[in-house]
Amino acid sequence: RRIDTGCKNLYGIMSQSGQYICINSAGDMYHIPPRCIVLNMANDEFRVYDFPATYNCAYHNRFYMIGSSYSYITSTYTYSAHTISLPSLEASEGLADYNAANETIMNMQSPYAIYISPLSGHMYVSDARSYATNGYVYEFDRQGVQLKRYLLRGVNPGRIIAM
């Protein structure tokens, strides 16, 4: 099937919660801004949001995302955090129950992944920092309070996978 969302440059890892998929649209990095698309796979309907979903995950009927918006015009990144509740598709700024983590995340040099453990409910966010330095993975509890920061030597922490 082909579904035309009207959004440019669908890019990145998608996350799924039940019948819903969260997809990032990077835009053109010049004049077309990034977007977030949530697709209902049961009926092919979708909703487009005016913020990026570059790094996203699903947990307890919500999509949590850190958006990364790059501009070739200014050569800068802008980061944002949003949550989309399911099935209402209501979007809000910040990371809902994890809002206490927002300040730490927005102060990261280069947020690069987000994951919430289905077992503990702890949220993990990586800071790649740069492509030439060691990165960090931050662990937050269910209220968004930082528990630990793990140094990853020689690794750019771009994906978090539960094993």
Q: Which residues does each PLM region occupy?
A:
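Beta-propeller fold detector
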Residues: R1-T5, F46-T54, E90-M106, L147-G154
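Solenoidal tandem-repeat scaffolds enriched in leucines and small polar residues
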Residues: R1-Y30
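Repeated scaffold domains used in trafficking and secretory/extracellular systems
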Residues: T5-Q16, D50-R62, M106-Y115, G154-M163
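Conserved beta-propeller blade signature
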Residues: Y20-I23, Y64-I66, G121-S126
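Short loop/turn segments immediately following the C-termini of beta-strands
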Residues: N24-D28, I66-S71, T76, A128-S130
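Structural motif
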Residues: Y30-V38, Y72-I84, A132-Y138
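Short loop/turn segments that connect beta-strands within beta-propeller blades
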Residues: N40-D44, S85-E90, F140-V145
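C-terminal structured domain segments
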Residues: N102-G144
